[in-house]
């Protein structure tokens, strides 16, 4: 089973259609949002290997894992492999991430769980002050996405990380805004 993120449905069908007949392989997939689980079946181990290689080459970075690897676990592994720390600019983003990362092994090495950012008694208010100052003339009710970006930028600078995230809460959904470098 391969796990993909952001792979368009049409490309999945086209990639499976390119399986060589001698592989005697087929694939089924199920998507939820932008995440797709793709199961490959073949009559032989060689056919399975070639079909999986074909899919990996077709989708490249869209493939984030295989088997039971969750998107959260893949993100933690990637951050750890690149020696990166992810900081949060606000409690809403912290709550969204904590619920997904708290049981992932190694998450504490790559995510601050708010201890160095929004939840810190000194740093949290600094993040908010810097974010509001950046938006300056937008008044008491700035656009939620612009405010989230400003919070992520402020958290990244104040905490000293290359990656920071903040949450824009809208009427119908939540948007996580990631600021890189």
Question: Which stretches of residues belong to each language-model region?
Answer:
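An accessory alpha-helical subdomain
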Residues: 1-51
């Amino acid at each position: 089973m391969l796990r993909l993120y952001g792979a368009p449905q049409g490309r999945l069908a086209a990639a499976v259609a390119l399986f060589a007949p001698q592989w005697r392989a087929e694939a089924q997939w199920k998507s939820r949002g932008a995440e797709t689980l793709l199961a490959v079946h073949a009559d032989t181990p060689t056919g399975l290997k070639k079909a999986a290689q074909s899919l990996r080459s077709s989708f490249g970075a869209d493939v984030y894992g295989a088997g039971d690897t969750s998107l959260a676990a893949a993100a933690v592994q990637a951050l750890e492999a690149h020696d990166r720390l992810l900081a949060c600019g606000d409690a809403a983003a912290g709550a969204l991430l904590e619920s997904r990362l708290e049981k992932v092994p190694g998450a504490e090495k790559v995510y601050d769980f708010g201890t160095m950012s929004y939840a810190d008694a000194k740093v949290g208010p600094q993040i908010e002050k810097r974010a509001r100052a950046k938006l300056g003339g937008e008044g008491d009710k700035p656009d939620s996405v612009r405010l989230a970006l400003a919070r992520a930028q402020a958290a990244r600078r104040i905490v000293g990380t290359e990656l920071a995230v903040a949450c824009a809460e809208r009427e119908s959904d939540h948007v996580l805004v990631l600021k890189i470098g």
